[in-house]
């Protein structure tokens, strides 16, 4: 997909407690890290009698040392820190949302489309974006929803 193919919309996101594993890793290690992190989060929340309240997600912020990654699940309640799993939250408020369907290698184009939409519509990013994975890596054309928290640009 190119940027022209993406349909970006502004949505209101409800704040949601999450359980996550965080690390700074080389970008090429992200797929393996995500698999391990999701498995660990599911084990910890099950042991705490919590359930996933949504699809797995990832938040990625480039740093000098690699990519800062936060991977986990929205939860039915707050998680107590255990092993590498920590409580966090998906921020509430306005966000730009765009669906990418296809290889994860192409998801940057969806991020670029959301960034351009913000600029074209009087909004700016209010925090790092996150990706919600609707399908697993075994699906030929996986669906990834990108959310970019945003705020109106002040004149």
Model-derived regions, located:
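A solvent-exposed interaction/effector surface
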Residues: 1-155
């Amino acid at each position: 997909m190119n940027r022209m193919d993406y349909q970006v919309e502004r949505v209101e996101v409800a704040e949601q407690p999450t359980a996550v594993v965080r690390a700074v890793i080389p970008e090429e290690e992200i797929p393996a890290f995500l698999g391990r992190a999701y498995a660990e989060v599911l084990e910890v929340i099950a042991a705490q009698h919590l359930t996933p309240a949504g699809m797995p997600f990832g938040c990625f912020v480039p740093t000098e040392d690699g990519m800062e990654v936060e991977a986990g699940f929205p939860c039915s309640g707050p998680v107590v820190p255990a092993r590498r799993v920590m409580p966090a939250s998906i921020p509430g408020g306005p966000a730009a949302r765009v669906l990418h369907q296809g290889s994860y290698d192409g998801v940057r184009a969806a991020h670029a489309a959301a960034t351009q939409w913000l600029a074209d519509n009087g909004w700016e990013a209010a925090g790092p974006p996150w990706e919600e994975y609707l399908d697993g890596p075994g699906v030929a054309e996986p669906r990834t929803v990108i959310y970019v928290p945003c705020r109106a640009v002040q004149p």
